[in-house]
């Protein structure tokens, strides 16, 4: 085993998350900004290389903090990244990943179905203009970006980083007499991290729609929270990679559904 296992854990997970962040450079930011409704005469800022650098730098800093926090706390609270752990200990990684495939696929199917259901309900409450903008927004996100940023980076931020931290904080504040976090601790942490995951999608939704409507809040919060619950459960019971697999599969489901006209 490496003399510095935590450093290896950090590097492995940070590099994976950074790949997801860099995949965001595949997005046409100028076309994306042009989708936002603005008052007539408003000058749309030019997307310069500096702006693109900031678009990468800010999430990279957050990623570093999340990965570091997870590395320091995950094992203490009984959470893990089995695939990354196998790489650290130089053991065969495939068996660790194989055990997470089925839970990840099932979770992705459930999460995708939930988002499609909430999308169908919300669609009846949205104007044709908003639906068109949501559709165009989806078309501007390449599949590699959806898979790598959504699947890798967001799971490292929200599950490995935030959820792990919440489990540890709740445990240390309210259950100090317990030798390990209880089921209630994990459930509360999953709920809170799912809500944060959902709320984190609201700003871009508001910018895209141009107003804060009940239908948008309903769809964004409930759809993303539903998947957050699935991903949180998978991380708790099977490991981080199962949540990553589920997240990636959800994006595949949504792309297929969108191309078939069954989603935005």
Feature annotation, model-predicted:
Residues 51-63, 216-223:
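Alpha-helical transmembrane segments of polytopic membrane proteins
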Residues 16-35, 67-75, 115-120:
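Alpha-helical transmembrane segments of multi-pass membrane proteins
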Residues 140-264:
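Transmembrane helix-loop-helix hairpins at the membrane interface
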Residues 78-153, 168-177:
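Juxtamembrane helix-loop-helix connectors linking adjacent transmembrane helices
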Residues 30-46, 126-138, 212, 217:
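Membrane-interfacial helical/loop segments at transmembrane boundaries in membrane proteins
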Residues 1-16, 55-60, 92-109, 241-244:
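Alpha-helical transmembrane segments and their helix-start/interface "positive-inside/aromatic belt" motifs
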Residues 66-82, 161-168:
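Membrane-water interface of transmembrane alpha-helices
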Residues 41-58, 137-147:
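Membrane-interface segments at the starts/ends of alpha-helical transmembrane spans
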């Amino acid at each position: 085993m490496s003399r510095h296992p935590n450093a290896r854990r950090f590097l492995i997970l940070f590099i994976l998350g950074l790949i997801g962040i860099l995949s965001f450079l595949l997005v046409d930011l100028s076309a994306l900004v042009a989708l936002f409704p603005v008052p007539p005469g408003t000058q749309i800022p030019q997307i310069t290389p500096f702006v693109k650098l900031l678009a990468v730098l800010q999430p990279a800093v957050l990623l570093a903090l999340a990965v570091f926090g997870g590395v320091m706390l995950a094992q203490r609270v009984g959470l893990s990244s089995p695939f990354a752990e196998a790489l650290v200990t130089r053991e065969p990684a495939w068996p660790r990943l194989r055990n997470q495939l089925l839970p990840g696929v099932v979770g992705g199917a459930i999460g995708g179905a939930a988002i499609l259901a909430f999308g169908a309900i919300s669609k009846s409450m949205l104007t044709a203009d908003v639906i068109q903008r949501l559709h165009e927004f989806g078309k501007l996100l390449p599949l590699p970006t959806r898979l790598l940023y959504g699947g890798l980076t967001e799971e490292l931020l929200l599950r490995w980083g935030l959820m792990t931290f919440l489990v540890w904080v709740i445990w240390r504040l309210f259950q100090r007499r317990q030798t390990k976090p209880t089921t209630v601790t994990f459930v509360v942490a999953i709920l809170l991290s799912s809500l944060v995951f959902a709320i984190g999608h609201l700003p871009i939704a508001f910018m895209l729609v141009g107003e804060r409507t009940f239908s948008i809040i309903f769809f964004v919060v409930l759809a993303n929270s539903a998947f957050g619950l699935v991903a949180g459960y998978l991380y708790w019971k099977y490991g981080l990679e199962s949540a990553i697999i589920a997240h990636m599969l959800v994006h595949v489901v949504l792309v297929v559904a969108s191309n078939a006209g069954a989603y935005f």
